[in-house]
Amino acid sequence: MSYLSNFQINHDELKFDIHHLNCSLVNAIRRIIISDVPTLGFRTENGRESDIIIEKNTSFIHNEFLAHRLSLIPIHYDHKKLESYDKKRFEFFIDITNNTTKPLDVTTEHIQIRDLSKEPPVILSKSETSKFFKPNPITKDYILINRLKSSKTGLSGDGEVLKLKMYADVSIGKEHARYSPSCVSAFNNKRDLDKIKIKWKNLFLFLVHAL
């Protein structure tokens, strides 16, 4: 007997039907999707070594708030390779100075990745990096991280600076919401048209016999 059917995948949304299962089991599946599916994230917690190292930040956002914001950025990675993922292989970094006369929005598009498994280490191409941090499928925008104020003089070295490095780790949503691969996971009952027809038919026959 098949319990799952009618899978529909549309951009970042997955829908499917569940048959012949109690609601308690369906709810358990929903909770597993939220809290027990492993994914990548940047860990940063008080009292433990942080995976986010901020080397220089002259923007108006203080380091703790910035680290928290970075930790909630979703990282796309092949789920089949998660078990063998090496935390020390990839170094994610941002090194940017706003030397323009306009404010600069720093987004996930500015994150670069250094492959430390190579000798010497190499920086991944923009196309390879975009596989980790994908733009919104509708707006094509990247996630905003920070905004650097413009240079007062327009001279090099006068603008705000953001320099940091990060290391991604594998975990699950039970530890922290940053490791949850699903922002929404819900279920609802569907109308069983076959059973409805049978009910109406039985009701009709009952009324006919009653007359």
Language-model features, listed with the residues they occupy:
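Protein-protein interaction/assembly regions in multi-subunit complexes
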Residues: 1-211
